[in-house]
């Protein structure tokens, strides 16, 4: 395979700065993007009218990356209204949120968030269909690296990311895969596959979009909704022949792991952090359900 990689990303304003938890402002995201936006690869960016000017200022005017195409979407909800309404209905049923150990996570309660996370594959598929991207294409989250969480020197992104990926869909894992049922993964908020970077040849992005869309709708039909990480895991389990998995020791290490560029990084063990967090959440979850069960009148 050719080592050239086209990048696709997206940013839509979700009002995340007003959330009670997992709060990040629009300016936070623009700063995150600014950290890696000088990368020299061809880039297609999907966004809304309000954000387009700021993105252009960063990518094109500040870093002079004219190999950039900005696609404006007036209303992201209208991209796939059936999918949006399905996710909304499942998210709002009450049980979808209460079922989880940590109901404050955005995938537990925010249907716009879950919908937008799934549109990653749609954006790349759309880029291919419009003739804007070909060959190996990588989705990369707009907020990749969170402004210095892993990579510490922005100037080290002044390079073109190249790597000879095979003719498969490449997913990157932060925890070892097991056979835990999907419902338990949703309940325990476990993470296996990261959604921040996905790499695949152009010919497989339409198939991937159709598969993740179908799996989200299937999950919605049984009363649940979740973000793209769980949906990607479902898709992998059903279609292993399409995929190649790669272990990562951080949510953001992919570009460092699969390029010849030298980066200055912070070491972060995602696995240990997740395990410590889960113990605290499990205790809270047990207390909550013990209280609920104590108030249920049982009739024999």
Model-derived regions: residue spans:
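Short catalytic/ligand-binding loop motif for oxyanion handling, primarily in non-cytosolic enzymes
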Residues: 15-17, 52-55, 78-81, 145-150, ...
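Catalytic core and acceptor-binding pocket of nucleotide-sugar-dependent glycosyltransferases
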Residues: 146-150, 186-271
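Short beta-strand-to-loop element that shapes/binds the nucleotide-sugar donor at the catalytic cleft/hinge
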Residues: 169-182
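Membrane-proximal basic amphipathic "stem/tether" segments
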Residues: 261-300
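GT-A fold catalytic core of metal-dependent nucleotide-sugar glycosyltransferases
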Residues: 112, 116-171
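Short, well-ordered beta-to-alpha junction loops that form the rim of enzyme active sites
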Residues: 48-49, 140-144, 248
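N-terminal anchoring/stem segment of glycosyltransferases
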Residues: 1-106, 115, 119, 127-133
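A structural signal for well-ordered alpha-helical segments within the folded catalytic domains
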Residues: 27-30, 118-122, 203, 226-230
């Amino acid at each position: 395979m050719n080592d050239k990689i086209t990048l696709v990303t997206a940013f839509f304003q979700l009002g995340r700065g007003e959330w009670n938890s997992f709060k990040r402002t629009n300016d936070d995201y623009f700063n995150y993007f600014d950290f890696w936006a000088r990368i020299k690869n061809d880039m297609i960016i999907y966004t809304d009218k309000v954000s387009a000017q700021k993105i252009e200022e960063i990518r094109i005017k500040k870093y002079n990356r004219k190999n950039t195409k900005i696609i404006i979407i007036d209303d992201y909800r209208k991209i796939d209204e059936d999918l949006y309404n399905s996710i909304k209905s499942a998210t709002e049923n009450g049980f979808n949120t209460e079922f989880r150990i940590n109901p404050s996570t955005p995938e537990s309660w925010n249907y716009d968030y879950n919908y937008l996370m799934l549109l990653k594959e749609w954006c790349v598929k759309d880029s291919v269909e419009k003739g804007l991207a070909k060959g190996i294409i990588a989705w990369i989250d707009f907020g990749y690296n969170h402004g210095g969480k892993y990579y510490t020197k922005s100037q080290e992104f002044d390079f073109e990311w190249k790597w000879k990926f095979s003719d498969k869909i490449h997913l990157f894992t932060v925890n070892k895969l097991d056979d835990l049922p999907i419902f338990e993964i949703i309940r325990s908020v476990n993470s296996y596959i990261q959604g921040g970077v996905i790499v695949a040849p152009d010919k497989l992005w339409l198939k991937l979009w159709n598969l993740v869309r179908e799996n989200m709708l299937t999950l919605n039909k049984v009363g649940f909704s979740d973000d793209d990480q769980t949906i990607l895991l479902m898709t992998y389990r059903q279609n292993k022949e399409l995929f190649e998995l790669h272990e990562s020791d951080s949510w953001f290490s992919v570009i460092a792991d699969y390029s010849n560029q030298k980066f200055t990084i912070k070491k972060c063990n995602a696995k240990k952090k997740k395990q410590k967090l889960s113990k605290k959440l499990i205790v809270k979850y047990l207390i909550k359900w013990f209280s609920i069960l104590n108030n249920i009148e049982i009739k024999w």
